[in-house]
Amino acid sequence: LDSASYNGFQFYAHDKIKYRPKSLLNSIFIEPRQIYKDSARNLTRNHLKSLKNFKLVKLKYNELNSDELTASILLTPLKKYSIRLNTEAIHSNIKQLGFSGGFSFLNRNTFEGAEIFKLSFQGSIFDISNNTGSDDTPFNSWEVGTDASLEIPRFVFPFLSNKIIPKNMGPKTVFSLGTSFQKNIGLDKQKFTGIVELSWKSTPRKTHTIEMLNAQFVKNLNTNSYFSIYSSEFNRLKTIQEEYFPDKNISTSNALTFISDEINTAFKANHPEDYQTAKNIEKRYDILTLNNVSPSISYAFTYNTQFDFKDNDYFFFKAKVATSGNIASILAKTEKDGVKTFLDIPIAQFTRADVEFKKFWKTSSASVFAFRSFLGVAVPYGNSDEIPFSNSYFIGGSSDIRAWKTYDLGPGSSNTGLEFNVSNFKFINSLEYRFDINRSFKGALFIDAGNIWDITSSKLTTADEKFTGLKSLENIAVGTGFGIRYDFNFLVLRLDLGFKTYEPYLGNNKWFQNYNLQNSVLNIGINYPF
Protein backbone atom coordinates (compact mmCIF):
# COMPACT_ATOMS: atom_id res chain seq x y z
CA LEU A 1 0.00 0.00 0.00
CA ASP A 2 1.35 3.39 -1.04
CA SER A 3 0.09 6.72 0.29
CA ALA A 4 0.72 10.43 -0.10
CA SER A 5 -0.64 13.70 1.27
CA TYR A 6 -1.14 16.83 -0.80
CA ASN A 7 -3.07 20.05 -0.10
CA GLY A 8 -5.23 18.42 2.58
CA PHE A 9 -6.01 15.32 0.49
CA GLN A 10 -4.85 11.77 1.23
CA PHE A 11 -4.00 9.49 -1.71
CA TYR A 12 -3.78 5.70 -1.46
CA ALA A 13 -2.91 2.97 -3.96
CA HIS A 14 -2.72 -0.81 -3.68
CA ASP A 15 0.65 -0.66 -5.37
CA LYS A 16 2.65 2.45 -6.17
CA ILE A 17 0.79 5.75 -6.66
CA LYS A 18 1.11 6.22 -10.41
CA TYR A 19 -0.71 9.54 -10.77
CA ARG A 20 0.74 12.80 -9.50
CA PRO A 21 -1.63 14.12 -6.79
CA LYS A 22 -1.37 17.65 -8.16
CA SER A 23 -2.61 16.48 -11.58
CA LEU A 24 -5.57 14.58 -10.14
CA LEU A 25 -6.59 17.59 -8.05
CA ASN A 26 -7.12 19.51 -11.30
CA SER A 27 -10.23 17.32 -11.72
CA ILE A 28 -11.41 17.34 -8.09
CA PHE A 29 -13.76 20.11 -6.96
CA ILE A 30 -14.68 18.81 -3.51
CA GLU A 31 -12.76 21.03 -1.08
CA PRO A 32 -11.87 20.23 2.56
CA ARG A 33 -13.86 22.18 5.16
CA GLN A 34 -16.36 23.42 2.57
CA ILE A 35 -20.14 22.96 2.52
CA TYR A 36 -21.30 19.88 0.59
CA LYS A 37 -22.55 20.70 -2.91
CA ASP A 38 -24.09 18.33 -5.42
CA SER A 39 -22.61 20.48 -8.20
CA ALA A 40 -19.06 19.88 -6.91
CA ARG A 41 -19.72 16.15 -6.71
CA ASN A 42 -21.07 15.95 -10.28
CA LEU A 43 -18.31 18.17 -11.62
CA THR A 44 -15.68 15.95 -10.02
CA ARG A 45 -17.21 12.78 -11.44
CA ASN A 46 -17.54 14.23 -14.95
CA HIS A 47 -14.02 15.65 -15.03
CA LEU A 48 -12.42 12.44 -13.82
CA LYS A 49 -14.33 10.49 -16.46
CA SER A 50 -13.25 12.97 -19.14
CA LEU A 51 -9.60 12.11 -18.44
CA LYS A 52 -10.23 8.78 -20.25
CA ASN A 53 -7.85 7.10 -17.80
CA PHE A 54 -10.36 5.33 -15.54
CA LYS A 55 -12.92 2.64 -16.24
CA LEU A 56 -14.66 3.27 -12.90
CA VAL A 57 -15.14 6.54 -10.98
CA LYS A 58 -17.05 6.22 -7.71
CA LEU A 59 -17.69 8.86 -5.03
CA LYS A 60 -18.68 7.86 -1.47
CA TYR A 61 -19.61 9.99 1.55
CA ASN A 62 -19.52 8.85 5.19
CA GLU A 63 -20.80 10.78 8.22
CA LEU A 64 -18.17 11.68 10.82
CA ASN A 65 -20.68 13.40 13.07
CA SER A 66 -23.88 15.41 12.76
CA ASP A 67 -22.33 18.15 10.63
CA GLU A 68 -19.24 16.61 8.99
CA LEU A 69 -18.68 14.21 6.10
CA THR A 70 -15.66 12.41 4.72
CA ALA A 71 -15.49 12.00 0.97
CA SER A 72 -13.79 9.07 -0.75
CA ILE A 73 -13.09 8.94 -4.48
CA LEU A 74 -12.45 5.43 -5.79
CA LEU A 75 -10.67 5.26 -9.15
CA THR A 76 -10.10 2.07 -11.14
CA PRO A 77 -7.56 2.78 -13.89
CA LEU A 78 -7.85 1.46 -17.40
CA LYS A 79 -4.95 -0.58 -18.73
CA LYS A 80 -1.94 1.64 -19.29
CA TYR A 81 -1.33 0.31 -22.80
CA SER A 82 -3.81 -0.65 -25.46
CA ILE A 83 -3.46 -1.68 -29.08
CA ARG A 84 -6.12 -1.49 -31.75
CA LEU A 85 -6.20 -2.97 -35.24
CA ASN A 86 -8.68 -2.01 -37.94
CA THR A 87 -9.38 -2.96 -41.54
CA GLU A 88 -11.69 -1.37 -44.08
CA ALA A 89 -12.88 -1.86 -47.65
CA ILE A 90 -13.10 1.35 -49.71
CA HIS A 91 -15.13 2.22 -52.79
CA SER A 92 -15.69 5.64 -54.39
CA ASN A 93 -15.85 7.34 -57.77
CA ILE A 94 -12.12 8.08 -57.42
CA LYS A 95 -10.89 4.89 -55.77
CA GLN A 96 -12.74 2.06 -57.50
CA LEU A 97 -11.72 -0.54 -54.96
CA GLY A 98 -9.36 -0.45 -52.03
CA PHE A 99 -8.42 -1.97 -48.74
CA SER A 100 -6.89 -0.26 -45.74
CA GLY A 101 -5.47 -1.39 -42.46
CA GLY A 102 -4.44 0.48 -39.36
CA PHE A 103 -2.59 -0.01 -36.13
CA SER A 104 -2.79 2.32 -33.13
CA PHE A 105 -0.95 2.26 -29.82
CA LEU A 106 -2.27 4.11 -26.75
CA ASN A 107 -0.24 4.97 -23.65
CA ARG A 108 -2.33 6.33 -20.77
CA ASN A 109 -0.86 8.40 -17.94
CA THR A 110 2.27 8.89 -20.03
CA PHE A 111 4.00 11.32 -17.66
CA GLU A 112 1.98 10.46 -14.52
CA GLY A 113 -0.36 13.39 -15.11
CA ALA A 114 -3.22 11.53 -16.86
CA GLU A 115 -1.80 12.40 -20.27
CA ILE A 116 -2.67 10.23 -23.27
CA PHE A 117 -0.11 9.49 -25.98
CA LYS A 118 -1.37 7.92 -29.21
CA LEU A 119 0.67 6.62 -32.12
CA SER A 120 -1.08 5.29 -35.21
CA PHE A 121 -0.10 3.89 -38.58
CA GLN A 122 -2.41 3.56 -41.57
CA GLY A 123 -1.82 1.91 -44.93
CA SER A 124 -4.06 1.49 -47.97
CA ILE A 125 -3.90 -0.08 -51.42
CA PHE A 126 -6.23 0.89 -54.25
CA ASP A 127 -7.28 0.09 -57.76
CA ILE A 128 -7.51 3.61 -59.19
CA SER A 129 -9.96 4.29 -62.01
CA ASN A 130 -7.97 7.18 -63.50
CA ASN A 131 -4.53 5.58 -63.47
CA THR A 132 -1.69 7.28 -65.30
CA GLY A 133 -1.35 4.30 -67.58
CA SER A 134 2.28 3.73 -66.65
CA ASP A 135 1.44 0.60 -64.71
CA ASP A 136 -1.66 -1.50 -65.31
CA THR A 137 -0.98 -3.83 -62.38
CA PRO A 138 -4.06 -4.16 -60.15
CA PHE A 139 -3.75 -2.45 -56.78
CA ASN A 140 -0.58 -0.61 -57.79
CA SER A 141 -1.63 2.51 -55.87
CA TRP A 142 -1.01 2.98 -52.18
CA GLU A 143 -1.02 5.46 -49.35
CA VAL A 144 0.73 5.28 -45.99
CA GLY A 145 0.60 7.63 -43.05
CA THR A 146 1.45 7.98 -39.41
CA ASP A 147 0.13 10.26 -36.67
CA ALA A 148 1.28 10.96 -33.14
CA SER A 149 -0.59 12.99 -30.53
CA LEU A 150 -0.20 13.90 -26.88
CA GLU A 151 -3.33 14.99 -24.97
CA ILE A 152 -2.65 16.84 -21.72
CA PRO A 153 -5.64 17.57 -19.39
CA ARG A 154 -4.50 21.11 -18.58
CA PHE A 155 -2.89 24.13 -20.21
CA VAL A 156 0.89 23.84 -20.40
CA PHE A 157 1.62 27.45 -21.32
CA PRO A 158 2.45 29.68 -18.30
CA PHE A 159 0.57 32.70 -19.69
CA LEU A 160 -2.70 30.71 -19.47
CA SER A 161 -3.23 30.39 -15.74
CA ASN A 162 -6.23 29.13 -13.76
CA LYS A 163 -7.21 32.76 -13.25
CA ILE A 164 -7.88 33.09 -16.98
CA ILE A 165 -9.39 29.65 -17.65
CA PRO A 166 -10.30 28.00 -14.29
CA LYS A 167 -9.88 24.26 -13.90
CA ASN A 168 -13.64 23.65 -13.74
CA MET A 169 -13.73 24.48 -17.47
CA GLY A 170 -11.61 21.39 -18.20
CA PRO A 171 -8.71 23.05 -20.04
CA LYS A 172 -6.86 20.71 -22.38
CA THR A 173 -3.76 20.94 -24.58
CA VAL A 174 -3.18 18.65 -27.56
CA PHE A 175 0.03 18.38 -29.59
CA SER A 176 -0.11 16.35 -32.78
CA LEU A 177 2.15 15.53 -35.72
CA GLY A 178 1.24 13.66 -38.87
CA THR A 179 2.57 12.72 -42.26
CA SER A 180 1.27 10.82 -45.27
CA PHE A 181 2.66 9.67 -48.61
CA GLN A 182 0.88 8.56 -51.77
CA LYS A 183 1.91 6.57 -54.83
CA ASN A 184 -0.10 6.51 -58.06
CA ILE A 185 -2.94 8.39 -56.35
CA GLY A 186 -3.54 11.67 -58.12
CA LEU A 187 -0.36 13.73 -58.00
CA ASP A 188 1.35 11.60 -55.32
CA LYS A 189 0.86 14.07 -52.51
CA GLN A 190 3.29 14.36 -49.60
CA LYS A 191 1.77 15.97 -46.53
CA PHE A 192 3.14 16.97 -43.14
CA THR A 193 0.97 18.45 -40.38
CA GLY A 194 1.71 19.91 -36.97
CA ILE A 195 -1.01 21.16 -34.60
CA VAL A 196 -1.05 22.82 -31.18
CA GLU A 197 -4.63 22.96 -29.86
CA LEU A 198 -6.20 24.38 -26.72
CA SER A 199 -9.78 23.68 -25.67
CA TRP A 200 -12.07 24.29 -22.71
CA LYS A 201 -15.76 24.28 -21.76
CA SER A 202 -17.14 27.54 -20.38
CA THR A 203 -20.39 25.64 -19.64
CA PRO A 204 -21.36 21.99 -20.17
CA ARG A 205 -22.85 23.04 -23.52
CA LYS A 206 -20.25 25.54 -24.72
CA THR A 207 -16.84 24.46 -26.02
CA HIS A 208 -14.04 26.77 -27.15
CA THR A 209 -11.14 25.54 -29.28
CA ILE A 210 -8.08 27.53 -30.30
CA GLU A 211 -5.53 26.15 -32.72
CA MET A 212 -2.46 28.18 -31.82
CA LEU A 213 -0.80 26.53 -34.79
CA ASN A 214 -2.04 24.31 -37.58
CA ALA A 215 0.88 24.04 -39.98
CA GLN A 216 0.43 22.05 -43.17
CA PHE A 217 3.12 21.38 -45.74
CA VAL A 218 1.84 19.93 -49.02
CA LYS A 219 4.06 18.84 -51.90
CA ASN A 220 2.95 17.13 -55.12
CA LEU A 221 5.59 14.77 -56.49
CA ASN A 222 3.94 13.78 -59.77
CA THR A 223 2.82 17.02 -61.43
CA ASN A 224 4.24 15.93 -64.81
CA SER A 225 1.47 13.33 -65.03
CA TYR A 226 -1.33 15.83 -64.40
CA PHE A 227 -2.99 15.56 -67.80
CA SER A 228 -2.62 11.77 -67.82
CA ILE A 229 -4.42 11.58 -64.49
CA TYR A 230 -7.09 14.20 -65.23
CA SER A 231 -7.80 12.84 -68.68
CA SER A 232 -11.12 14.65 -69.16
CA GLU A 233 -9.29 17.99 -69.01
CA PHE A 234 -6.75 16.84 -71.59
CA ASN A 235 -9.56 15.57 -73.83
CA ARG A 236 -11.21 19.01 -73.72
CA LEU A 237 -7.92 20.61 -74.79
CA LYS A 238 -7.51 17.95 -77.48
CA THR A 239 -10.93 18.83 -78.88
CA ILE A 240 -9.96 22.53 -79.05
CA GLN A 241 -6.68 21.66 -80.75
CA GLU A 242 -8.31 19.43 -83.36
CA GLU A 243 -10.96 22.03 -84.19
CA TYR A 244 -8.84 25.18 -84.35
CA PHE A 245 -5.20 24.04 -84.60
CA PRO A 246 -5.17 20.81 -86.66
CA ASP A 247 -1.54 21.38 -87.64
CA LYS A 248 -0.39 21.43 -84.01
CA ASN A 249 0.48 18.41 -81.95
CA ILE A 250 -0.72 18.18 -78.37
CA SER A 251 0.15 15.55 -75.78
CA THR A 252 -0.16 15.21 -72.03
CA SER A 253 3.41 16.48 -71.69
CA ASN A 254 2.99 19.72 -73.67
CA ALA A 255 -0.63 20.66 -72.87
CA LEU A 256 0.38 23.68 -70.77
CA THR A 257 2.70 24.92 -73.52
CA PHE A 258 -0.18 24.63 -75.97
CA ILE A 259 -2.36 26.85 -73.76
CA SER A 260 0.31 29.52 -73.26
CA ASP A 261 1.30 29.59 -76.97
CA GLU A 262 -2.07 29.31 -78.71
CA ILE A 263 -4.83 30.36 -76.31
CA ASN A 264 -4.14 34.08 -76.56
CA THR A 265 -6.06 37.34 -76.92
CA ALA A 266 -6.70 36.78 -80.62
CA PHE A 267 -8.18 33.35 -79.91
CA LYS A 268 -10.35 34.86 -77.16
CA ALA A 269 -11.83 37.41 -79.55
CA ASN A 270 -13.00 34.71 -81.96
CA HIS A 271 -13.79 31.85 -79.58
CA PRO A 272 -14.56 33.24 -76.10
CA GLU A 273 -16.18 30.08 -74.71
CA ASP A 274 -13.35 27.75 -75.70
CA TYR A 275 -10.84 30.35 -74.51
CA GLN A 276 -12.51 30.31 -71.10
CA THR A 277 -12.52 26.50 -71.04
CA ALA A 278 -8.77 26.35 -71.68
CA LYS A 279 -8.05 29.04 -69.10
CA ASN A 280 -10.20 27.22 -66.54
CA ILE A 281 -8.15 24.08 -67.15
CA GLU A 282 -4.96 26.08 -66.66
CA LYS A 283 -6.33 27.60 -63.46
CA ARG A 284 -7.31 24.18 -62.09
CA TYR A 285 -3.83 22.91 -62.89
CA ASP A 286 -2.37 25.75 -60.82
CA ILE A 287 -4.67 24.98 -57.88
CA LEU A 288 -4.23 21.21 -57.85
CA THR A 289 -0.45 21.18 -58.40
CA LEU A 290 0.33 24.01 -55.99
CA ASN A 291 2.88 23.15 -53.32
CA ASN A 292 2.25 25.25 -50.25
CA VAL A 293 2.90 25.87 -46.60
CA SER A 294 -0.24 26.82 -44.64
CA PRO A 295 0.58 27.92 -41.07
CA SER A 296 -2.84 28.89 -39.72
CA ILE A 297 -4.43 29.85 -36.43
CA SER A 298 -8.12 29.41 -35.67
CA TYR A 299 -10.87 29.79 -33.11
CA ALA A 300 -13.99 27.62 -32.93
CA PHE A 301 -17.08 27.92 -30.75
CA THR A 302 -19.45 24.97 -30.31
CA TYR A 303 -22.85 24.95 -28.62
CA ASN A 304 -24.32 21.48 -28.18
CA THR A 305 -27.38 20.57 -26.10
CA GLN A 306 -27.03 16.80 -26.65
CA PHE A 307 -26.95 15.02 -23.29
CA ASP A 308 -25.39 11.77 -24.55
CA PHE A 309 -25.15 9.75 -27.77
CA LYS A 310 -28.65 8.33 -27.20
CA ASP A 311 -30.22 11.81 -27.10
CA ASN A 312 -32.11 12.39 -30.38
CA ASP A 313 -33.71 15.73 -29.53
CA TYR A 314 -31.07 18.45 -29.44
CA PHE A 315 -29.50 21.51 -31.06
CA PHE A 316 -25.92 21.90 -32.36
CA PHE A 317 -24.13 25.05 -33.53
CA LYS A 318 -20.49 25.54 -34.51
CA ALA A 319 -18.65 28.58 -35.86
CA LYS A 320 -14.98 28.58 -36.83
CA VAL A 321 -12.66 31.29 -38.14
CA ALA A 322 -9.15 30.53 -39.41
CA THR A 323 -6.43 32.68 -40.91
CA SER A 324 -3.27 31.43 -42.58
CA GLY A 325 0.17 32.82 -43.30
CA ASN A 326 0.12 36.18 -41.54
CA ILE A 327 2.89 35.68 -38.99
CA ALA A 328 4.87 33.32 -41.23
CA SER A 329 4.86 35.84 -44.09
CA ILE A 330 6.69 38.34 -41.87
CA LEU A 331 9.51 35.86 -41.32
CA ALA A 332 9.48 34.43 -44.86
CA LYS A 333 11.93 34.91 -47.69
CA THR A 334 10.72 37.17 -50.51
CA GLU A 335 11.56 35.96 -54.01
CA LYS A 336 12.28 38.19 -57.02
CA ASP A 337 8.67 37.95 -58.18
CA GLY A 338 7.47 39.13 -54.75
CA VAL A 339 6.23 35.71 -53.62
CA LYS A 340 7.01 34.89 -49.99
CA THR A 341 8.36 31.39 -49.43
CA PHE A 342 9.46 29.05 -46.67
CA LEU A 343 11.97 26.35 -47.72
CA ASP A 344 11.29 27.52 -51.29
CA ILE A 345 7.57 26.66 -50.92
CA PRO A 346 5.01 29.51 -51.28
CA ILE A 347 3.19 30.46 -48.07
CA ALA A 348 -0.59 30.30 -48.40
CA GLN A 349 -2.43 33.37 -47.12
CA PHE A 350 -6.18 33.20 -46.69
CA THR A 351 -9.03 33.63 -44.23
CA ARG A 352 -11.74 31.00 -43.90
CA ALA A 353 -14.99 31.09 -41.89
CA ASP A 354 -17.46 28.20 -41.42
CA VAL A 355 -20.83 28.10 -39.69
CA GLU A 356 -22.78 24.87 -39.12
CA PHE A 357 -26.22 24.41 -37.57
CA LYS A 358 -27.96 21.11 -36.79
CA LYS A 359 -31.34 20.45 -35.18
CA PHE A 360 -32.90 17.10 -34.28
CA TRP A 361 -36.56 16.52 -33.38
CA LYS A 362 -37.59 13.22 -31.82
CA THR A 363 -41.07 12.69 -33.28
CA SER A 364 -41.61 9.29 -31.63
CA SER A 365 -39.62 6.56 -29.91
CA ALA A 366 -38.71 5.19 -33.34
CA SER A 367 -38.37 8.28 -35.57
CA VAL A 368 -36.38 11.51 -35.81
CA PHE A 369 -36.36 14.58 -38.06
CA ALA A 370 -32.81 15.86 -38.65
CA PHE A 371 -31.82 19.20 -40.25
CA ARG A 372 -28.35 20.46 -41.13
CA SER A 373 -27.22 23.79 -42.61
CA PHE A 374 -23.65 24.77 -43.49
CA LEU A 375 -22.19 28.03 -44.80
CA GLY A 376 -18.51 28.51 -45.54
CA VAL A 377 -16.34 31.13 -47.22
CA ALA A 378 -12.58 31.29 -47.87
CA VAL A 379 -10.84 34.40 -49.21
CA PRO A 380 -7.23 34.45 -50.50
CA TYR A 381 -5.11 37.59 -50.15
CA GLY A 382 -1.55 38.83 -49.97
CA ASN A 383 0.75 36.03 -51.05
CA SER A 384 -2.05 33.91 -52.58
CA ASP A 385 -4.35 34.25 -55.56
CA GLU A 386 -6.11 30.95 -54.90
CA ILE A 387 -7.18 28.88 -51.90
CA PRO A 388 -5.08 25.71 -51.51
CA PHE A 389 -6.95 22.63 -52.69
CA SER A 390 -7.06 21.12 -49.18
CA ASN A 391 -8.74 24.27 -47.82
CA SER A 392 -11.23 24.72 -50.67
CA TYR A 393 -14.87 23.61 -50.68
CA PHE A 394 -16.36 20.80 -52.75
CA ILE A 395 -19.88 19.49 -53.07
CA GLY A 396 -21.38 16.02 -53.41
CA GLY A 397 -20.73 12.68 -51.77
CA SER A 398 -22.11 10.47 -49.01
CA SER A 399 -22.24 13.23 -46.35
CA ASP A 400 -23.15 16.11 -48.67
CA ILE A 401 -25.55 16.29 -51.62
CA ARG A 402 -25.98 12.59 -52.14
CA ALA A 403 -27.42 12.79 -55.66
CA TRP A 404 -23.99 13.80 -57.00
CA LYS A 405 -20.62 12.12 -56.60
CA THR A 406 -17.86 13.90 -54.70
CA TYR A 407 -16.47 16.91 -56.65
CA ASP A 408 -18.93 16.38 -59.56
CA LEU A 409 -21.15 19.42 -58.97
CA GLY A 410 -20.54 23.15 -59.43
CA PRO A 411 -19.32 25.75 -59.18
CA GLY A 412 -22.64 27.54 -59.65
CA SER A 413 -24.57 26.60 -62.77
CA SER A 414 -21.44 25.54 -64.64
CA ASN A 415 -21.12 21.96 -65.82
CA THR A 416 -17.43 21.58 -66.52
CA GLY A 417 -17.37 17.80 -66.82
CA LEU A 418 -13.94 17.99 -65.18
CA GLU A 419 -12.63 16.13 -62.13
CA PHE A 420 -12.29 17.72 -58.70
CA ASN A 421 -14.44 20.84 -58.95
CA VAL A 422 -13.73 23.10 -55.97
CA SER A 423 -14.39 26.72 -55.06
CA ASN A 424 -14.30 29.20 -52.16
CA PHE A 425 -17.94 29.61 -51.09
CA LYS A 426 -20.34 26.86 -50.03
CA PHE A 427 -23.95 26.71 -48.88
CA ILE A 428 -25.79 23.45 -48.18
CA ASN A 429 -28.94 22.33 -46.35
CA SER A 430 -30.19 18.81 -45.64
CA LEU A 431 -33.41 17.49 -44.14
CA GLU A 432 -33.73 13.82 -43.24
CA TYR A 433 -36.50 11.72 -41.73
CA ARG A 434 -35.06 8.71 -39.90
CA PHE A 435 -37.20 5.81 -38.74
CA ASP A 436 -36.84 2.28 -37.40
CA ILE A 437 -37.67 -0.70 -39.61
CA ASN A 438 -36.84 -3.15 -36.86
CA ARG A 439 -34.38 -3.25 -33.98
CA SER A 440 -31.25 -3.05 -36.15
CA PHE A 441 -32.45 -1.93 -39.59
CA LYS A 442 -33.25 1.77 -40.03
CA GLY A 443 -34.70 3.73 -42.92
CA ALA A 444 -34.42 7.34 -44.08
CA LEU A 445 -35.97 9.78 -46.54
CA PHE A 446 -33.87 12.83 -47.35
CA ILE A 447 -33.55 16.03 -49.36
CA ASP A 448 -30.23 17.83 -49.90
CA ALA A 449 -29.82 21.28 -51.44
CA GLY A 450 -26.72 23.38 -52.02
CA ASN A 451 -23.81 24.35 -54.23
CA ILE A 452 -20.38 25.97 -54.33
CA TRP A 453 -19.53 29.29 -55.99
CA ASP A 454 -16.60 31.61 -56.63
CA ILE A 455 -16.74 34.93 -54.75
CA THR A 456 -13.37 36.36 -55.80
CA SER A 457 -12.80 38.95 -58.50
CA SER A 458 -10.80 36.48 -60.59
CA LYS A 459 -11.21 36.99 -64.32
CA LEU A 460 -10.53 33.30 -64.93
CA THR A 461 -13.89 32.18 -63.57
CA THR A 462 -17.00 32.45 -65.70
CA ALA A 463 -20.16 34.30 -64.75
CA ASP A 464 -22.06 31.06 -64.13
CA GLU A 465 -19.48 30.06 -61.50
CA LYS A 466 -19.71 33.29 -59.49
CA PHE A 467 -21.91 34.17 -56.54
CA THR A 468 -23.37 37.60 -57.24
CA GLY A 469 -26.12 37.83 -54.64
CA LEU A 470 -29.48 36.32 -53.85
CA LYS A 471 -30.14 35.62 -57.53
CA SER A 472 -27.31 33.08 -57.45
CA LEU A 473 -29.40 30.98 -55.06
CA GLU A 474 -31.34 29.92 -58.18
CA ASN A 475 -28.31 27.71 -58.84
CA ILE A 476 -28.81 25.62 -55.71
CA ALA A 477 -28.90 21.97 -56.75
CA VAL A 478 -31.47 19.67 -55.15
CA GLY A 479 -31.19 15.95 -54.58
CA THR A 480 -33.68 13.62 -52.92
CA GLY A 481 -33.58 9.96 -52.01
CA PHE A 482 -33.89 7.23 -49.45
CA GLY A 483 -31.53 5.18 -47.33
CA ILE A 484 -31.20 1.87 -45.52
CA ARG A 485 -28.97 1.69 -42.43
CA TYR A 486 -27.88 -1.18 -40.18
CA ASP A 487 -27.05 -0.34 -36.58
CA PHE A 488 -24.18 -2.40 -35.12
CA ASN A 489 -24.43 -0.42 -31.84
CA PHE A 490 -20.80 0.73 -32.16
CA LEU A 491 -21.30 2.06 -35.73
CA VAL A 492 -23.97 2.42 -38.41
CA LEU A 493 -23.50 1.04 -41.93
CA ARG A 494 -25.35 3.31 -44.35
CA LEU A 495 -26.59 2.89 -47.93
CA ASP A 496 -28.19 6.04 -49.41
CA LEU A 497 -29.56 6.30 -52.95
CA GLY A 498 -29.70 9.88 -54.25
CA PHE A 499 -31.68 11.16 -57.25
CA LYS A 500 -30.93 14.37 -59.16
CA THR A 501 -34.06 16.45 -58.63
CA TYR A 502 -33.07 20.00 -59.65
CA GLU A 503 -29.99 20.47 -61.86
CA PRO A 504 -28.98 24.16 -62.11
CA TYR A 505 -26.74 23.62 -65.15
CA LEU A 506 -29.57 22.42 -67.41
CA GLY A 507 -31.54 24.63 -69.80
CA ASN A 508 -35.03 25.96 -69.22
CA ASN A 509 -36.39 22.81 -67.59
CA LYS A 510 -34.19 21.89 -64.64
CA TRP A 511 -36.60 19.76 -62.60
CA PHE A 512 -36.71 15.93 -62.71
CA GLN A 513 -34.88 15.62 -66.04
CA ASN A 514 -32.58 12.84 -64.81
CA TYR A 515 -34.71 11.57 -61.95
CA ASN A 516 -34.19 7.85 -62.59
CA LEU A 517 -32.16 4.86 -61.43
CA GLN A 518 -29.71 5.18 -64.31
CA ASN A 519 -28.55 8.60 -63.12
CA SER A 520 -28.90 7.95 -59.40
CA VAL A 521 -25.90 7.75 -57.06
CA LEU A 522 -25.43 4.99 -54.48
CA ASN A 523 -23.58 6.23 -51.40
CA ILE A 524 -21.92 3.87 -48.94
CA GLY A 525 -21.08 5.47 -45.62
CA ILE A 526 -20.23 4.80 -42.01
CA ASN A 527 -22.51 6.44 -39.39
CA TYR A 528 -25.03 9.16 -40.14
CA PRO A 529 -24.28 11.90 -42.72
CA PHE A 530 -24.72 14.57 -40.02
Write out the residue ranges for each language-model feature.
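Flexible hinge/switch segments at interdomain interfaces of large molecular machines
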Residues: 2, 10-25, 271-275
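C-terminal soluble interaction/assembly domains
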Residues: 31-37, 107, 463-469, 480, ...
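C-terminal outer-membrane beta-barrel translocator/porin domains of Gram-negative envelope proteins
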Residues: 9-10, 90-95, 209-435, 446-449, ...
